[in-house]
Structures are given as C-alpha cells and as structure tokens.
Amino acid sequence: MVAIIVHGGAGTIRKEERIPKVLEGVREAVLAGWKELKKGSALDAVEEAIKVLEDNPIFNAGTGSVLTIDGKVEMDAAIMRGKTLEAGAVAGIWGVKNPISVARKVMEKTDHVLLVGEGAVKFARIMGFPEYDPTTEERRKQWQELKEKLMKGEVRHWKKLGELIKEHPEVLRSTVGAVAFDGEEVVAGTSTGGVFLKMFGRVGDTPIIGAGTYANEVAGASCTGLGEVAIKLALAKTATDFVRLGLDAQAASEAAIELATKHFGKDTMGIIMVDSRGNVGFAKNTKHMSYAFMKEGMNEPEAGV
C-alpha cells in the first residue's frame, strides 16, 4: 500500500493566524508528492513534496530559511533510498533555490554522501543550479528583532542554543521533510534553513544520515526540532530500528519521541515515518508540528498541527 507523509516543522507557532497557511502549505506539498507517487516513484514523490515546501516562504527551508548569527542563509538537506541505502546530502549551502534537488544530485552523480559549504555550492553550479537568494524580508526583520532582544540587558556572551530556545521559542524554526513508500521502497528526505541565530558553520541533524534523515528496507524517517538532539540519539535510524523490532510506523514514531523527551526534555523534537507496509506515523513533544499524509484509499489528505 503506497503512502506519503510530510511535515512543516516542529516548534511553537506563535501567531495563530499563521496556522491555516501552514496547513495549506503541507496539504499542497503532500498532494504534489502524491501525484508523483501515483506514477510509481517514492524518490520523485519525496523530492517534489519537499520542493513545494522549500518554495513556500512560510516554512524554514529554501525560500524563507532563517538567518545565522551573522545574517546569512546556510541550508541543509538530505535524501535517502531505503532499498539501496543510497543517500545524498548538502550542508551549509547557499545561493540555491532547492537544496533537496542538489542533495539528490549528490546521491546520483557522485560517489559521496555529503558535500558542505563552498564545495556544495560549486557542485550545484556544475549541475546547472542557478544563483538564487532565498532570503525574505520577513526573515530579515525577524532576525533583526530577535538579535536586538538578545542583545538587551547585561548579556555579555551568547548562551547555549538550548537555553536560548527555552527563553525564546521562536528561535526554533525547524525543518521540512517527507517520507514515502511506493510499494517497492521507502524514501526519506529532509530540508532546513537551520535554527535562527545559529553559529556560522553550524550543521544540524537534517543532512546527517541516521540522525535527521534515514531510510532502509523496513521504514524511513524525517526528524524536525533541535538538531543536536537527533544527532546525539541517531534518532531517524533509531526509529527505523523500532520498526525492525516489530513496531509499526506510528508506534515507532512515539517511541522515538519518548526517547528524545527522556534524555533532552520537552519542546525538542518531532518525527514523521512510513514503513514498508504502507503505515504512516508522526509524533512530537513540541506544541506544534504541521503534517499531512495520503494513503491508498484516501481521496483527500489528512492534515494537522
């Protein structure tokens, strides 16, 4: 049974009026992915769904990515095929519209898994991806306001990211992702602009295979939230291990988030999954995580936050 699920990031949506736009965005993405999935390719479905999310400035990936501490955009993305364990990823890339498509090219056109920074940008140009500025005025304004807020008072040094997020949940702008099963294989993909005010050069879980993105013959997972948590727990791979041990995608998602909460507390993580039986799963320990999914037999996607 074929299935696809997408997420638009875990965290706190401060402005309630944004929720309908977020729901519309994940619905649009899952429908675009479903269209490709019905043609038979989970790989095309995952890439297309994530491209739609990257192109929507309400999400923190591609256009509308958040800014680093020095006001720049550095994006991460990864994609992985469960049948062959082929994977491609980029980290700290800038000047491209769709990092997920560059990640796919890394998988298909090189012997490598991960390209970073200037090397990733050079590779993108060689592959024909044109120069593109993903910065939006809204993100620039948010960056200025947040930086001013943090600079007020007696703060003489930058606090650890985890402490900042507890005091200012809006820092956690999270990630987008998709996981699909086409009847033959599971594919997972994730893309992000990272965390607001992250240090230059910071890489989160998204492009780390096994941490934020993973797929094998039994399941696939895409994580969202505070990347350092997913890295330390190898959370995407761990979630698929739960499926190998007999859980379905939903139970495995819940088990993965319980693990994250146990070790690192609430407001840290969300996950989506699909297993090789066509089950979808999603769980979070944050206030919100936008998601939408389609399975065989459904006429319309189910979506929520």
Swiss-Prot record:
Keyword annotations: Autocatalytic cleavage, Hydrolase, Protease
Source taxon at top rank: Archaea
Pfam families: Asparaginase_2 (PF01112)
Reaction(s) this enzyme catalyzes, per UniProt: L-asparagine + H2O = L-aspartate + NH4(+)
InterPro entries documented for this protein: Ntn_hydrolases_N (IPR029055), Peptidase_T2 (IPR000246)
Binding site for substrate: 202-205, 224-227
GO cellular component, one term: cytoplasm
PTM characteristics: Autocleaved. Generates the alpha and beta subunits. The N-terminal residue of the beta subunit is thought to be responsible for the nucleophile hydrolase activity.
Record-level Gene Ontology MF annotations: asparaginase activity; peptidase activity
Catalytic activity, EC: 3.5.1.1
List of catalytic residues: 175 (nucleophile)
Activity relative to temperature: Displays activity at a broad temperature range and is highly thermostable. Optimum temperature is 80 degrees Celsius.
GO-annotated biological processes: proteolysis
Reported uses of this protein in biotechnology and industry: Absence of L-glutaminase activity, ability to remain active at a wide range of pH and temperature and long term stability at cell culture conditions suggest that this enzyme is a good therapeutic candidate for the treatment of colorectal cancer and hepatocellular carcinoma.
Gene3D superfamilies: (Glycosyl)asparaginase (3.60.20.30)
Feature type site, description Cleavage: 174-175
Recorded effect of pH on activity: Optimum pH is 8. Exhibits activity from pH 5 to 10.
Record's function text: Catalyzes the hydrolysis of L-asparagine into L-aspartate and ammonia. Does not exhibit glutaminase activity.
UniProt family annotation: Belongs to the Ntn-hydrolase family.
UniProt subunit comment: Heterotetramer of two alpha and two beta chains arranged as a dimer of alpha/beta heterodimers. The uncleaved protein forms homodimers.
Remaining remarks: L-asparaginase is an enzyme of therapeutic importance in the treatment of cancer, especially lymphomas and leukemia. It functions by reducing the availability of circulatory L-asparagine to tumor cells. This P.abyssi enzyme shows 78% to 55% growth inhibition of cultured human caco2 and HepG2 cells when subjected to an incubation time of 48 hours.
The name this protein goes by in its record: Plant-type L-asparaginase
Organism (species): Pyrococcus abyssi (strain GE5 / Orsay)
